Every structure is written in structure tokens, then in C-alpha cells.
């Protein structure tokens, strides 16, 4: 939920955006505004991997044998770079011209399908070595702490301080809402509201509420992801300590 999910996601009826717009007599308007604040004109939402899968992939980086993991890591990195599209235009143009079949892709984000397969595979390699008992307990616990620290720490950072690290599209929302309120006032012969700067004042208040709702969505998702990571890490730790039988 970092970027507001997908283009069609709207603000909740019990959120701050809805409360502000309700005060302006625009009841239900929040459910017509997109919570997405990314740069794509349309998106069906981010590629889903799952927090536990990412944690296990990090564990795989620490535990999987080099010959098995490096090609998976390389594939993930290259596919993510390709998915950046115009944000890494030089690399995108190179791939478009010289990578066979790449110019047939409908969107650059299609490359993330490879990541969806590679990340669980990396986690599976870690679980396979764990199940076979090939890893000394001390090394396993160190790797477990590292993987949980990296992935869980990132979630904790976003949950605690993420609201102050990003603007959540506030500036763009303020511009958009200024135009929207101005159009509403002009359409209803309320020119005096524009003369008093009410279009800008209302837009700023609405943009603040929109950013707050987006930040709340991100924090909730970060806390939820942290819980999933801790549960997965706890399961692996119990297995490592022989508290869970390998055949369970």
C-alpha cells in the first residue's frame, strides 16, 4: 500500500479526506478520489510477493549455495531495473533494441513476473537446506537474525517514521483539488469564494487529509507485513531449535 494500491483505490469513508469533504458539503466525494499517488497513468496495483516470501528470500541469500543463488539474484535485479522503464531510460532503450523479444512486451512491468517466480524460489532453496539439516544451528540463527533484521527493520522504519519521509503526493493533490474546487465554485456561481481564496484554502486542507490517509494506509500495511515476517521468522527459529519436527 506504499503508493496507495491501484489506480481505482479510493479513500475510506471513515478517513480524514472524507471528513474534510463532508464538512464542505461534498459527502461521498472521497470515494471518487484515487488514493494512488504514483506516476503511472493507470496501474492495477503493485506486483504482489508477500512479506514472508521476501523474508525467506533474504534468508536464501544468506544460506543458499552460491552457484544456485547468484543467477536468481541477478535475474531479480535485472528485471526490476527493466521494470523502471523511463525512470532508467538508457537501460530500457538498450534492452528494447538488443534484448530478443523485449520489444514485444506490452508494458515494462511485465518483467516483474520473473521476480514473482524468483523470490519464492530463493526462499525455497533456504527451506530445502534447512529441512535437510545441512546448516549448523549457530549459522542458521545468525542468518535468521540478519534476514529478519533487514526485512523487519525496513517495515518497522516505514511504520514508525514513514509518514515523515515522504509527501504522499500532497503537492500534486493540492494542485488537482484547487482546480476542482475552482471549477465547482464557477459552475455554481460562487465567484466570491474564489476571490476570497477559498479554492486554495479548501484544496490545501483536502490535500493534507489525502496525504494523511495515504500515510495511514502505508503504516497499516507496514505493521501487517512486520507481523507476517515475525511469524515466519518464529517458525524458522522453532524449527532450528528442534521445537518443530521437520515432518510437521
Where are these regions (language model features)?
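Extended surface/linker regions that mediate inter-domain or inter-protein docking
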Residues: 57-63
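Individual transmembrane alpha-helix segments
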Residues: 1-56, 210-227
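Contiguous transmembrane helix-bundle modules in multi-pass membrane proteins
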Residues: 64-248
Amino acid at each position: 500500500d506504499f503508493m496507495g494500491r491501484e489506480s481505482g483505490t479510493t479513500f475510506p469513508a471513515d478517513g480524514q479526506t472524507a471528513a474534510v469533504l463532508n464538512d464542505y458539503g461534498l459527502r461521498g466525494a472521497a470515494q471518487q478520489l484515487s488514493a494512488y499517488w504514483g506516476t503511472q497513468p493507470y496501474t492495477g496495483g503493485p506486483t504482489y510477493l508477500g512479506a514472508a516470501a521476501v523474508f525467506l528470500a533474504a534468508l536464501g541469500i544468506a544460506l543458499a549455495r552460491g552457484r544456485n543463488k547468484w543467477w536468481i539474484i541477478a535475474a531479480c535485479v535485472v528485471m526490476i531495473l527493466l521494470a523502471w522503464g523511463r525512470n532508467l531510460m538508457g537501460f530500457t532503450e538498450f534492452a528494447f533494441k538488443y534484448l530478443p523479444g523485449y520489444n514485444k512486451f506490452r508494458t515494462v512491468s511485465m518483467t516483474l513476473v520473473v521476480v514473482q517466480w524468483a523470490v519464492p524460489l530463493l526462499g525455497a532453496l533456504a527451506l530445502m537446506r534447512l529441512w535437510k539439516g545441512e546448516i549448523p544451528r549457530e549459522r542458521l540463527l545468525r542468518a535468521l537474525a540478519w534476514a529478519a533484521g533487514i526485512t523487519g527493520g525496513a517495515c518497522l522504519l516505514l511504520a514508525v517514521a514513514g509518514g515523515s519521509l515522504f509527501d504522499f503526493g500532497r503537492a500534486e493533490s493540492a494542485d488537482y483539488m484547487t482546480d476542482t474546487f475552482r471549477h465547482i465554485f464557477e459552475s455554481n456561481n460562487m465567484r466570491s469564494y474564489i476571490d476570497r481564496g477559498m479554492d486554495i484554502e479548501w484544496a490545501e486542507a483536502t490535500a493534507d487529509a489525502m496525504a494523511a490517509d495515504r500515510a495511514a494506509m502505508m503504516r497499516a500495511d507496514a505493521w501487517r507485513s512486520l507481523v507476517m515476517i515475525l511469524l515466519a521468522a518464529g517458525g524458522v527459529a522453532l524449527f532450528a531449535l528442534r521445537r518443530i519436527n521437520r515432518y510437521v
